[in-house]
């Protein structure tokens, strides 16, 4: 059986000037001549990907698609049309992302995470609604570092991440610092593996590793203020978040570290770079 949207190994059953047919005598699909390996003969087995051409006919290719049925990938928008956006997925015919499958407004030249599915008309399409395509059986444990792609941003809950393009992950609101958009690539740490297998993430490393990075951020901001920060560790969480993109707890740890190493001093509710020798 020929499977739409999947890579499969099919036998060569007929050879024509314009290409070859692969499959069997009852069900076969055309592999255009330009994709036929040199020296191919009847009976040979070829790995092909099956999709539909511009006339909606089943067609085979030996080119490598960016994703196959049910997989998630980060694809770039080539153009916008009346029916949706067309994505570059490595094949001659671009992949349609219908408007109803878009979760945010997409723009040409930008990349977004999508999954490949078959619509009601038996055509391959892309969807940005990838939640149901993600799995919960990841190999990751607490404190593991992961790579992921942001697929949803919810101001009340946090940032949803497709870990490795396969697994459920989320950065809870309390761990979100800075702005994120759908399609952003992130590196994060697993802080908790939930009972259902979903991963709770943080953009910050463990405290003992993160403190030096936070201290460096504080010093950079101090220098941007000509060496005097107009607030101290007693400032509101909102001010600290706005100025340094970190929590108040992280800021206090960084300030304490800098005080201990005598790189700063605090006076009159201000933080200064320590210029004393």
Residue ranges and their predicted role:
Residues 1-277:
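Single-stranded RNA-binding regions, centering on S1/OB-family and related RNA-binding modules
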């Amino acid at each position: 059986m020929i499977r739409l949207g999947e890579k499969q190994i099919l036998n060569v059953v007929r050879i024509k000037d314009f290409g070859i047919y692969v499959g069997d005598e009852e069900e076969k699909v055309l592999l255009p001549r330009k994709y036929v390996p040199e020296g191919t003969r009847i009976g040979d087995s070829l790995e092909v990907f099956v999709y539909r051409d511009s006339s909606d006919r089943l067609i085979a290719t030996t080119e490598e698609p960016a994703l196959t049925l049910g997989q998630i990938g980060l694809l770039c928008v080539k153009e916008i049309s009346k029916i949706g956006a067309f994505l570059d997925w490595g094949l001659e015919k671009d992949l349609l992302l219908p408007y109803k499958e878009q979760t945010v407004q997409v723009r040409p030249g930008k990349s977004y995470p999508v999954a490949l599915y078959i619509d009601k008309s038996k055509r391959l399409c892309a969807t940005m609604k990838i939640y149901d395509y993600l799995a919960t059986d990841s190999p990751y444990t607490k404190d593991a570092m992961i790579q992921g792609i942001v697929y949803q941003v919810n101001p009340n809950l946090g940032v949803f991440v497709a870990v490795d393009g396969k697994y459920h992950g989320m950065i809870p609101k309390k761990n979100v610092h800075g702005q994120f958009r759908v399609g952003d690539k992130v590196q994060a740490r697993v802080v908790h593996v939930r009972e259902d297998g979903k991963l709770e993430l943080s953009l910050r490393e463990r405290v003992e590793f993160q403190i030096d990075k936070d201290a460096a951020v504080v010093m950079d901001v101090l220098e941007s203020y000509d060496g005097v920060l107009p607030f101290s560790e007693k400032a509101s969480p909102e001010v600290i978040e706005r100025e340094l993109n970190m929590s108040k707890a992280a800021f206090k740890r960084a300030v304490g570290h800098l005080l201990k190493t005598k790189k700063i001093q605090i006076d009159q509710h201000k933080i200064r770079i320590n210029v004393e020798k």
